[in-house]
Amino acid sequence: MPKFAANLTMLWNEIDFLDRFEKAASAGFTGVEYLFPYAYPKEQLAEKLATHKLVQALHNLPAGDWAAGERGIACIPGREGEFQDSVGKGIAYAKALGTQAINCLAGLTPKDAPAEKVHETLIANLKFAAAELKKAGIPFVVEAINTRDIPGFHLHNTRQTLAVLDEVGAEDIFFQYDIYHMQIMEGDLTPTIRANIARIK
């Protein structure tokens, strides 16, 4: 059976973020997700989850300067150290919140770097993250995003994303298959899901 978590980034935007946990519980949800927890102390978020008997289903690794338009840094050469630090921060929050999975946003394809270098950087960063998350016992997922909503997003379809995960070679890295994004990019959802269900979270 499907399990649904309320996305607190998208829902109830008319009220303060910290008040959305109560809204989710009142609406019958038992799990929540949101883009990033890092603007709030871990302890404060953990208290909200416990008070309203909610599970933290997912959050993303830090994704660079979101307000400035960045959408992840995993594919950006020269920022490997920052990415590694972001993995540590993501794990610290996930442990405090009991997060069931961490997602990595690859980022926008940099226009000033050779394609081969961009690819090498992404693979190396995902290998690092997969190893660290495995040690922490936290499931790891990678998401493809449609390029209509986010032009230039590096991972944007099923075949490309699964090929990247194959190259990373970790047994416990999965594809966060977002039906909304993949319908825009490629359609044919049911056969794609059936063919790849073992690799989808």
Show which residues each predicted segment covers.
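Active-site-proximal loop/turn and secondary-structure-junction residues that shape catalytic pockets
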Residues: 10-12, 38, 62-63, 106-110, ...
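N-terminal pre-domain/capping segments
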Residues: 1-95, 99, 162, 166, ...
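Hydrophobic residues within beta-strands of alpha/beta enzymes
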Residues: 32-33, 102, 140, 201
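Histidine/acidic-residue-rich catalytic or RNA/ligand-binding cores of hydrolases
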Residues: 185-194
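Active-site acidic/histidine proton-transfer and metal-coordination neighborhood
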Residues: 73-174, 184
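Hydrophobic residues in well-ordered beta-strands that form the structural core
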Residues: 56-58, 142, 177
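His/Asp/Glu-enriched short active-site or ligand-binding loop at hydrolase and phosphoryl-transfer sites
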Residues: 174, 200-201
